[in-house]
């Protein structure tokens, strides 16, 4: 990994107040983003911008991954669900934060991306990440309940199944909307859901039975 490039990017994110937690900084410094994108795009791996990975999908900008990890309040040992694996990069960053005692389940609906992300994550040694082929809008009951759930595509609202699979005290982070999207944070407290608007964002659409 080109250390100078990633150090520069992370330094800018810290200076701009995007990331503050040392665990998030360490994870972003550790995960080799260039391994998760097409070889033809590798020279752009450490530019803080979304990049196309094929099939109409993107790998999120580094700052967005950092913001989402911060807002999820991730910690060691947590059980996490990701809806929308894409390249697998975001799941790898989360895996670094929750550690070997934590678990990350990530669901991808596009078979080619499922196969590629699964292969890369295995090659890089992320044994606590399980990649599942399926409709992420239904969640993944088998590994629930989850301490944290995040969605990497924007839907009309958050699928009910995700709230049902969330532990009490758990957090869901998801972009909501079609053309104009808002990153929303939901917290489940004693069975009730409390929501908070965070910032305006732009994600690919959430496709599935409970999406678009």
From Swiss-Prot:
One of its GO terms (cellular component) is cytoplasm. Pfam families: PCMT. It comes from the Archaea. Disulfide bonds: none annotated. The active site is at residue 60. Keywords: Cytoplasm, Methyltransferase, S-adenosyl-L-methionine, Transferase. One of its GO terms (biological process) is protein repair. HAMAP family: PIMT. Belongs to the methyltransferase superfamily. L-isoaspartyl/D-aspartyl protein methyltransferase family. This is Protein-L-isoaspartate O-methyltransferase. It comes from Methanococcus maripaludis (strain C7 / ATCC BAA-1331). The lineage of its organism: Archaea, Methanobacteriati, Methanobacteriota, Methanomada group, Methanococci.
